[in-house]
Amino acid sequence: MIHPLPRKPSTTSYYKSTSALNPRLVEEDNFPVNGKTSEQLEFLLNYAVLNPSIHNTQPWVFKITDDAIELYANTRVLATADSNYRELIISCGIALFDLRIAIRYFGYRDIVEVFPEPYNPNLLARISFGSKRIVQLEEKFLFRAISKRSTERFYPANRNLPKSLISELESVTDSECTRLQILTSIVPDSSRREVIKLVDKGDRLQTKDPLFRQKLSQWINSNHEDIPIASSVATLMLIGSQNDNEYAWLATGEALGHLLLRARIDDVKVSCLNRPIQVPELRDSALWGFPPLKRLSRVRSRLQALFPDCGYPQILLHLCYQ
C-alpha cells in the first residue's frame, strides 16, 4: 500500500522537488565531472524531470544522498482517476528510465534497485553510479531526444509508420519486461473500431469532455473517400504487462519512457488514449489481488479480452507523423 510521503527530510540527505530544478536551462557541458557524486546526481535529475507524466502532475519526489538518488511516489498530487496509484507509478517509471539514460550518457553504468525497502512502499527505486563505461550510439540518440520529446493530445495521421520502426518499438518495450500489441495492420478493422469505441465510452463516463469527443469523432470518421482514419493510417499501440502490480507498473513506465524517446528520434507524435483503462465507474466483479485491492474496470477487461497476448492492459497510445 502506498502511503503519503514524510514532509521533512532526514538529516543525512535532502529532497529535491521538480520546482527546484531548471531542466530547460541545463547544458551538458556543465556536468560537474570533478564534483561530488551527490552534485553529479543532482545535475542528472534535470533530465529525469523533463519527461511528461500521464496526468501532467509530475508525481515524483527525488531524495539525494551522498551516493544515490531515491525515487519516491508523491501521492499528494494524486489524480482522482488514479485511485490505485497505477498511473502515478507508471509516470515515475518514465522519469526513472530518463535518469538511467542520462547516467549512461555521462559515462557510468546505472545501478537500480526497485522497491528496495518493503516497509517503505513509497520508495520506488534507488539509483546509483556503477563503474565507468563508454556510451553507446543508441544511448546518445535517446539522450538527445529527452530534451525534445513531448506528448500531444491528437495529431492527424497522414501516413503509416514503417514496419521497421514498429518492430523497433516492439523490441524496446520487450526489453523493459512488458509486452506490446500493435493495433495496426495485424489486427482486423473490427477490433480497431471496438478499441476506439471504448476510448469514447471511457471519456463520456469519466470527464464528459466535449472537445475530446469531437476530435475523437473526427478521427473515427474521415471525410476523405469515406475511409475511417482508425482503420487506415492511424497507429494504435497497447502496452500490457504480464502481471498487474507495482513492479509491473514501474516496468511499464520504463518501457513507455523508452518508447517515447525512440519515437521522438523519428519525429513520431505520441498521444495517450488511456481513458478506457482509467474509468473507475466501470468496475468488474472480479477482484485482482495486489494491495491496494481494486477491481479491474469492465472496459479494461474488454481490452484484455480483445488482445489476450498483451497481458494486462496498461497504456493505450496513438502514434503518428505530423
List the predicted regions and their residue ranges.
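Acidic, surface-exposed loops and disordered segments
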Residues: M1-Q322
